[in-house]
Amino acid sequence: MDYEEILFGLQPILNASSIKDVPMNDVYLGSYLAVMDQLAVSLREPSNRDIVGKTGLLLNLVRVLEQALDICFHDTSISNNDKIAFYEISSEVIRCIANAIIDNDDNREVLLDSGGKKLLNYYIGGVLQLDEISSDKSEDSLVDKLQMRSVVLLRNFCIGNLKYTENLAPFIRGPLFVLLKTTQYSYLSSPEKVVLGSDLLNDILKVNYSNVQISDLFFLSQYIKKISSNVQNKELQAMEDGAVEAYSNTETQKFAGQGNQEYIEKEEEDDEEDVNCELLLNLSTCLETIVAKDETINFTNEEQLVLSMQKNLILSLVCLESKTFNNKLIVMRRLISCAGNISANLTNSNKREQSLCTETIKSSASSYALAAALMILCNSVASKSDAVALLKLISLSELIQVGSLLQDPLQYQGFLDLLRKLLNLENAMWLDIKDLFTLFQIMRRCHEQTKYYNNLRSLLTNLLNKTLTVLPSSKIHNLISSDPTIISFIAEHGTLTSCIAMDKLLVSKKALPKEAITSLWDSIFKFQNLGQAEQLGISDLFHITKTVGIYLKDSSVTADVNPIENILFKDYIQKLTLILETILSFKENKDKGSESCFNNGKFIAGIILNIVKNTKCLTPEEQNLEALAKSFF
């Protein structure tokens, strides 16, 4: 750049003690703006940024900008129309400073040291909250340009620097909300400003998410609903699905990963569809960040706003489900996460939302809307009476059928936990066999998803355990007899689940194929060292000994002719010995868990002695087991 020429052109502004003393008629103003445009363009070159920082020009620009904005905001001696010149000067100076600090920490420090804190925290925040400059709205384009450049300045100052962002966040978060609120119904007329503003708010909220007003949360949900209706179907490249899936399985991104390229001015036409998609992604991320991270949100006495928020989110999901657009999977997951986190807040009873959710379940085919509704309903059940009340609004059969529509792993969370809460001994008895088959099909499909989303495993196992516990043994036997693959599904869920299933099958008094029994015993005895707590806890050991005791007491379930030929003696005698050795070591323990396990072990030992007492020829392993059993007495 021709640095001397630029300095010469800016001399009247730079040398004046106050910018108010500088001539601002059209000729002079046009000259200043032209020189600053030249400077802003030249600052796209990194070497030129170094020059303005080291020569003091940047320092002077900060001073001029603060003076100009102070006149705009506080000087009542000049008319609003006369202030337009100062707003135009401010706009160009903001542009120059924004470009000067791109990827330049030295210049960022110059900005701070020269009074930049007040400039950024107060004056730029004020620019973001401008609604108009002139009463006739004739300068709306100037306001738009001022605000867009201010957002760029803030973004270029913060990007890649956590400390700067944390310091700026408390002062800028509110003005950014105001900026977005004023554009809610006209965002397509200033798309670049809105997208950049929402992106900056996204970064700000990552470090400053507490104490956001409930009304602002409602505003975000309202804005999301509006954008959702404007999103249009879009042809995506074949590779995008894979890219989206990979991104969506990543938890909240680290600050350092939030882009490494500062915004450098460009003159391009904004694609309306891209604006909707980008804004939808940014705002859904903003809302999710707040409701997921801020545990102090208090929804007390805000029931109507909460209901409206959840309605907005569910309607957005319904609207978006049938559309194809960029980052769809990420957005849909974030929206159900928003609904789930709002409903999980301890100050939210979710009772008002029950009608909305049951209506959604009965009328909608949108899997993501259904998932959100199931999450909300799940969080509305906190007691047995809550469960009874909810089942008057919707039946277990209806809920089970809804589960067939779920596909995305994240959609299953509310379904699994809600069913677990609602199932009990009484209503399980009346479940139709078709519903039970459907339920197990859903659980198996969900089980396949746990390979990719491990967080589902505990929810699935808990529901499976509850289902096996409350179902009559005859129904479990009929299920397994009709579909042998159910046994392998149960067995894959480990010791406790297999013990519950085995107990029920033993109680049914009906014979099962030996393969089914073997599969369960293999799962029950899938341990290496009982002494390692992480391998098997007291609770699991209690259930194993309980199941072994029941089995040995009534070994007729194996259809063996000779008691000594039962499957535990034939195939699992080493495991049985290891269990008894471990339990025997609990003999002197006084905790209830150890005492219960020891009592079960003593019961098993008595049965073993009864089995072998009339047997003339024992193998060495059986002799060792007999001696071990005697040690319990």
Q: Where are the regions a protein language model picked out?
A:
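Alpha-solenoid HEAT/Armadillo-like helical repeat scaffolds in large eukaryotic proteins
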Residues: 12-16, 63-71, 122-127, 182-186, ...
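Eukaryotic acidic, Ser/Thr-rich intrinsically disordered low-complexity regions
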Residues: 605-633
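Eukaryotic tandem repeat interaction scaffolds
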Residues: 340, 358-366, 375-392, 397-408, ...
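C-terminal structured domain segments
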Residues: 572, 576, 580-603, 607-609
